[in-house]
Amino acid sequence: MSDRVHERSMGMEEEGSTKNMKTKVLELPTKIKKILKNIWKVGKDDPRRVKHALKVGVSLTLVSLLYLMEPLFKGIGNSAIWAVMTVVVVLEFSAGATLCKGLNRGLGTLIAGSLAFFIEFVANDSGKIFRAIFIGAAVFIIGALITYLRFIPYIKKNYDYGMLIFLLTFNLITVSSYRVDTVIKIAHERFYTIAMGVGICLLMSLLVFPIWSGEDLHKSTVAKLQGLSYSIEACVNEYFEEEEKDEETSDLSEDTIYNGYKTVLDSKSADEALAMYASWEPRHTRHCHRFPWKHYVKVGSVLRQFGYTVVALHGCLKTEIQTPRPLRGLFKDPCVRLAGEICKVLSELAASIRNRRHCSPEILSDSLQVALQDLNTAIKSQPKLFLGSSQNGNVSQGNSGRHNPNVAVSQHINKDTNEAASYQNTGTPRGERMSRFGPNVSFSRLRADTLERRSAAATNERKILRQQLSRIVVLTSLEFSEALPFAAFASLLVEMVARLDNVIEEVEELGTIACFKDYDNNVDQKDVEVRVEKPADLVVGVE
């Protein structure tokens, strides 16, 4: 009997495994299609990735000729593999990143080789023991010094890779020279092949479809301004829609408002990396000054501070307690006009940076001040919504707290508190107390029993009050609580107007340092009235 049960269970397991295998085989085409779709999407989002991949392939093919062609191999030898390794390590997505790594690797190798040659020259005529001690001391001092220097922020940011290559090359040559006599010759050959690899990387990065980090940083700043403008307009339009939308999925990647300000919040590390790589690129202004890439980082920091208010504004759409839509409609026109003026300013700033010109002198027009004043007037015209209505309170009291939860809660608290106080004073009925203690009860026993009853009554009272106070927080006046969410929404719009000054100031300072052209009212008039559109996704290649 047990054998049959075992065979049956084995058969069921085999049948289940067969079904799972068939399911996986049937799902295989779908998975392959999904992978191919993702690969296609990567290239479609940024076609420069395809160009970079082709450049890497061509560079590796060129350095491989040092191994494949016999005349070149005889002249260089096995050190040709270092050229291949250099291309793999140095060739980056942007020209600035390639220059940074290439020059760091080249200079680090050259300086380390020169220092190792000097140490070899000094220790060559000494005895074997003294030479070993001298090499060991040099390795210790140089290793400790270079490692300590790597902790300096400026060196860590700009020359960390070069310091690492220097330390590696120096130890490789210095330590190997103690046992190998031809180590200097090998070092020369490796330096030549590394120089060949770096040269090929620089030629491919600077001359063949160059990708500039500075241009990426410039475009990303414009895209961030456009993204904030789009998010603000979309938030206000959705907040004042007459019909409520269906519940959306929790996937934030599909939220267009979130995608508008997401790049701003996540831009700190990308901006700093792009600014550093751009500082290595041979790009100058028309006055032959270095372009102020670091000031783009400051603009990004100010935009992040401004973006936090957009995040809070978006959060007003997701709160559990919402102002009724008829009540929102009372303030729709001034809010929409104010948001439109804010978006207009952001769009003008984006056009200013995109065209490398100063902002319009009338960027903060009277329309913004008028829209702000209209919103203030609209709010003051409805004081009962924000300060509460005494009439509503009287009606609620007349209906025994049915319409005003505070009254019912207060009555319930008073009732429970009176009951607790009654228990505290009496504890038990008078007759029961007298029969319980009797005429001969001692004073100490009576005092202890009284303290015990008071402690129990105080504990019960605290429990009652805590429960009822938590209800008071939630069950506030209905009319007052409905106006609170809109008050938060309106205050965030006003806060945006206040923070616009900081954004305008930083953009104008950037234009002054970068020598932007002056604003021409005739030429740039078409850029003043900018329509707010969803910004195109900018893919920045930072590795």
From Swiss-Prot:
* Keyword set includes Coiled coil: yes
- Task performed by this protein: Malate transporter.
Membrane-related topology note: Multi-pass membrane protein
What highest taxon heads this organism's lineage?
Answer: Eukaryota
| InterPro entries the record matches | ALMT
Its family remark reads:
Belongs to the aromatic acid exporter (TC 2.A.85) family.
Output the Pfam families linked to this UniProt entry: ALMT
GO BP annotations, alphabetical order: malate transport; monoatomic ion transmembrane transport
- Identify the PANTHER family for this entry: ALUMINUM-ACTIVATED MALATE TRANSPORTER 10
Q: Mind telling me which GO cellular component terms the entry cites?
A: membrane
Q: Which residues form a coiled coil?
A: 445-472
Chief place of localization: membrane
Instruction: From the record, give the transmembrane residue ranges.
Output: 56-76, 80-100, 106-126, 129-149, 164-184, 191-211
Bias class Polar residues marks the residues at 419-428
Task: Report keywords, A-Z.
Answer: Coiled coil, Ion channel, Ion transport, Membrane, Transmembrane, Transmembrane helix, Transport
Please give the organism: Arabidopsis thaliana (Mouse-ear cress)
Its protein name is Aluminum-activated malate transporter 14
Q: Which compartment or compartments is the protein found in?
A: Membrane
Annotated region Disordered: the residues are 416-438
